[in-house]
UniProtKB/Swiss-Prot annotation:
This is Prokineticin Bv8-like peptide 2. Potent agonist for both PKR1/PROKR1 and PKR2/PROKR2, and inducer of a potent and long-lasting hyperalgesia. Also potentiates capsaicin-induced TRPV1 current when tested on DRG neurons. At subnanomolar concentrations, this protein both induces potent chemotaxis of macrophages and stimulates LPS-induced production of the pro-inflammatory cytokines IL-1 and IL-12. In vivo, potently stimulates the contraction of the guinea-pig gastrointestinal (GI) smooth muscle (nanomolar concentration) and rabbit aortic rings. GO terms for biological process: endothelial cell proliferation. Disulfide bonds join C26-C38, C32-C50, C37-C78, C60-C86, C80-C95. It is found in: Secreted. The lineage of its organism: Eukaryota, Metazoa, Chordata, Craniata, Vertebrata. Belongs to the AVIT (prokineticin) family.
Amino acid sequence: MKCFAQIVVLLLVIAFSHGAVITGACDRDVQCGSGTCCAASLWSRNIRFCVPLGNNGEECHPASHKVPYNGKRLSSLCPCKSGLTCSKSGEKFQCS
């Protein structure tokens, strides 16, 4: 009986769901607004989102420093904001 109830709930969820809408999706930096870049998703490199540029103390990718970048970014991290640099801090890279 418990399994039957779970199946009914699952079918109701499927019937009333409308699918996911991805806002801020992009392919390249030029599609994003000022102060953002088009970074790859952590879950799938084929999905990209407009993400804010890194602030002081936030994690960054050392090879990803040009905005707008003409190609497709492979990193899920944006470059640092203007005036900040991406430098190694312990085990990771941070904007400073």
